[in-house]
């Protein structure tokens, strides 16, 4: 999953698994991406001998519903694995082989948003990525609206046409539907940052009771007085640099 940060761990030579991927292939495959995790598992002998293909949980659900024996991925899910070329709609097999991963694990990639099969006569399309599905389901005017989503992490997403230039990090370009793309800014800590503060306060008070209501009341009081905390919410690092940590100032 996106919260699996094992690929950020440091190996004996002082480099992380993701840094090895970058050095050997030129690709930035961030911790939590499918092939970053697969690379870690492969290097540490954790890939089951009976494993056949790589896919996301949504793709597996489609397989179970339709009875298909091979995963068929929408470009939005394929891109979340890493080593995916959006322009060609294919994975870079050569890059995978450079880090010792078998291209046989690659799933099939769909063109567009086709029906993958049927569940009791009901058509089942390929699964969309969670960011793309959330955008599709919540934004009314895709050409003019932004989607702001705060959960454990946080995301800001904007829909652009296929010819829109690829941005630089920390913005990502992600495949969407009908040939369009999403520009996405993601933080690993959204609501998790508030949960971390609540956990700290609870531990300090040595109580098992949640402290969110008290924190909310203190926040309202601080807004009125102007004595607010300044928080850098990178407590779990960033996708680009997992070693960065957060801070709470003006305590």
Language model segments and positions:
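Carbohydrate-associated surface elements
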Residues: 4
């Amino acid at each position: 999953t996106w919260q699996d940060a094992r690929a950020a761990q440091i190996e004996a030579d002082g480099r992380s698994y993701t840094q090895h991927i970058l050095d050997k292939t030129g690709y930035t495959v961030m911790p939590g991406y499918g092939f970053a995790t697969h690379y870690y598992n492969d290097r540490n002998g954790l890939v089951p001998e009976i494993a056949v293909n790589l896919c996301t949980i949504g793709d597996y659900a489609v397989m179970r519903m339709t009875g298909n024996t091979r995963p068929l991925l929408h470009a939005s899910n394929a891109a979340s694995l890493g080593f995916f070329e959006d322009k060609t709609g294919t994975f870079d097999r050569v890059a995978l082989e450079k880090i010792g991963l078998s291209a046989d694990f690659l799933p099939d990639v769909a063109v567009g948003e086709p029906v993958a099969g049927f569940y009791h006569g009901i058509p089942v399309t390929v699964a969309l990525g969670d960011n793309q599905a959330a955008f599709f389901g919540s934004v009314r005017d895709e050409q003019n609206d932004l989607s702001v989503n705060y959960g454990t992490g946080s995301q800001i997403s904007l829909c652009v046409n296929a010819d829109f230039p690829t941005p630089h990090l920390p913005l990502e370009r992600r495949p969407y539907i009908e040939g369009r793309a999403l520009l996405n800014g993601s933080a690993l800590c959204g609501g998790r940052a508030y949960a971390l503060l609540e956990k700290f306060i609870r531990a300090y008070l040595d109580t098992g009771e949640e402290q969110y209501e008290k924190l909310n009341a203190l926040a309202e009081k601080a807004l009125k007085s102007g004595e607010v905390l300044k928080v850098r919410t990178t407590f779990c690092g960033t996708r680009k640099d997992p070693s960065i940590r957060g801070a709470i100032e003006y305590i």
